[in-house]
């Protein structure tokens, strides 16, 4: 399984009054090609997707279009986790639509991701800050809470 982790895109950022959206669009177009060329199976986007709690509409449109391309019709699994610059509820809002594309959205550390189909993948178990997805011969355990202890038997520690 090939996994790619990325973070801190800060879409919608302005520097001294100048938009960086055109640069960000070029970056994301290149990023999509890298993910395809490297045959990435699982993509983790770990926070600060946007530069502010209230990103410009163009930034949101760019993000959603990029996710759609990256998901490859639900073949590629994507986990998106909100960062301190993101509005957690806003980031999770398209979650029901994203499911068909294999995209899981976690806005807050204790998000319970609903079990069921996500594109061509299945979330078979979930709890606060954790979801479990079978993948070929492996099982993926996504602890999306910082420092969740996983016990030897695979259970989530009550601590």
Which stretches of residues belong to each language-model region?
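N-terminal active-site segment of His-dependent metallophosphoesterases
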Residues: 1-66, 72-75, 153, 159
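His/Asp/Glu-rich metal-coordinating catalytic cores
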Residues: 55, 79-159
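Anion (oxyanion) recognition and catalysis
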Residues: 71-72, 99
């Amino acid at each position: 399984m090939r996994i790619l982790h990325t973070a801190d895109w800060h879409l919608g950022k302005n520097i001294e009054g100048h938009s960086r959206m055109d640069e960000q669009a070029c970056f994301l177009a290149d990023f999509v090609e890298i993910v395809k060329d490297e045959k990435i199976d699982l993509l983790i986007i770990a926070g600060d997707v946007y530069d502010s709690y209230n990103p410009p509409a163009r930034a949101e449109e760019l993000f959603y279009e990029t996710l759609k391309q990256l998901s490859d019709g639900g073949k590629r699994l994507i986990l998106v986790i909100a960062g301190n610059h993101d509005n957690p509820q806003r980031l999770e809002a398209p979650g029901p639509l994203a499911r068909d594309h294999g995209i899981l959205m976690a806005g807050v550390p204790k998000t319970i991701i609903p079990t069921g189909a996500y594109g061509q993948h299945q979330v078979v178990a979930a709890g606060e800050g954790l979801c479990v997805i079978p993948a070929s011969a492996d099982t993926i355990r996504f602890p999306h809470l910082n420092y969740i202890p996983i016990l030897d038997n695979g259970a989530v520690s009550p601590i």
